[in-house]
Amino acid sequence: MAFGDLLEKVGSAGPFQLLCVLLLTAPALLIASHNLVQNFSAISPEHQCRPPPPGTNASWVGNSTAAPGGLSLAPSPERCCRLAGTHGQRPRRNGSLGREGETEPCRDGWYYDCSTFSSTIVTEWDLVCDLGPLPALAQMLFMAGVLLGALLFGVFSDRFGRRVILLCSLLLVAVMGTGAALSSDFLTYCAFRLLSGVGLSGFLLNYICLSLEWVPTKSRALVVTWLSYCSTAGQVVLAGLAYSIRDWRWLQLAISTPFFIFFLCVWWIPESARWLIVNHRPATALSNLQRVARINQKQLGGDSISLEMVEKVGGSLPEKSTCSCLGLFHTPAMRRISCCLMSVSFSTNLAYFGLSMDLPAFGLDIFLVQTFFGAIDILAKMACTLALSYFGRRAIQASSLILAGVFLLGNIPVPREMLMVRLALVVLGKGCLAASSVCSCLYGGELFPTAVRQTGTGFTTVMARLGGMVAPAVLVAGQQFPFLPLVIFGVAPVVSGIAACFLPEMHNVPLLDTIEEVEDRARRKGEETPARETVAHVVHSTRI
């Protein structure tokens, strides 16, 4: 008897499974809010030096632009210096003055344009001028927390269980996200953001895993697709929340405090019976299965399961793999698969988060841009899901990356005045990157053999998190070299798309179990299409 037989006895697609997925849908909708909240909470508004005490600088009198709260912003191009003299002469663009005055740093702080947001971390802690890169540092630390969480909670989940780690992750996001909203200084804020990233990563690793282990094989694709679309739709949810809440502290609270409720709701979901059986806890597994049977109104089926049956299923489940990570690079075929997939994961996340974190660069309403980004991601994922069944994995993976790079590189020569053209190219590029992420998740799971599947997936996940960490640094460099972000975000997907052409096709191909089988497949001449033919096919597809 297999575990699937036990699940059928207690109900594999009943009210319990529906409630389980619905309870995990709500927190999934706020994943994007935590990833991208700094698009709004760390926005840098127009700003200008505060003047010296009254009577010492006449240059702030007259011909000024009114700001909320009775403040006045003089229309000067200078943001990080002010006149030191009293003769009313404005600094030139190069920072120098005429004979009548000199410039000095903004010693009394800044005035900010609060017409869009009443408060951000930038306006509260004066993160402008020399401190301008610090918001990007906070985002990098958050992504570092996501990476750290992936390294820690993957191991902890296998050792302590899906449910325990999921609950701890939800509580960590709730507490640390709330702490970030109540932070009194920037360093404290960064620390809370890093730890909330750790918690969010733990949730990401376990919420799909726990739900999948309670549903039958035939329903797994549907569950994964639904939860994936919910997390993508969270970008639109974030736009709505940010539009309604213009103070960064209240916005941070709005996306964090619901996780206390999610923690209480998810407490109802029992531990995965499959995990309990694998870890030699058949009695608890039996209790959970019978509880599911009661909820699904399959009491007779639950009562028919005995402890001996559960123990017998435990003996039939596969043992944990003892292959080390060196198996990913030990043979030529595995090296090619591992390196290509790591490149794909890194470049996809690098460009995806780089575009997602740079909303003000488009010169349009940031709430509208965020909504467009969320909508195109949903459409792209739907299109990719359908295309994978007809055109295969390799062509879709390579085409989506190369097209993304072409759209982004094509944006470079477009004049800045053509805002809608620039936005359209970026939205299309981001949609291709969303399709690439869907394809890589499926493709990676199929390419790695069972012996190293979890290890290989873990390595590609780490590379994806590294890409997300590097993206804010590229945007900071773009402040000095404006063309650099689009060049990097465009070239990286093209290079990875070409690398994807060297991967074997897995459409309608049985999954392999050992590294030796992977090498045997690579040696069989008829199994692989030459890479140059795949490149030609991809180029033809992009032209179409």
Predicted regions and their residues:
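Flexible cytoplasmic loops linking transmembrane helices in multi-pass membrane transporters
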Residues: A2-Q17, L71-P133, R294-M357, A361, ...
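C-terminal transmembrane bundle
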Residues: A32, L36, R193, Y207, ...
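Central mid-sequence intracellular linker of multi-pass
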Residues: I43-G101, P105-D108, V215, L222, ...
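Cytoplasmic helix-loop-helix junction between adjacent transmembrane helices
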Residues: W125, S183-F186, C190-Y229, G240
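Cytoplasmic loop-to-transmembrane helix junctions
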Residues: L134, C168, S219-W226, V452-F459
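Helix-breaking motifs and short loop linkers at transmembrane-helix boundaries and internal kinks
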Residues: G161, L182-L187, G199, I245, ...
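Structural signature of the two symmetry-related core transmembrane helices
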Residues: V164-T178, L187, S228-Y229, I396-G410
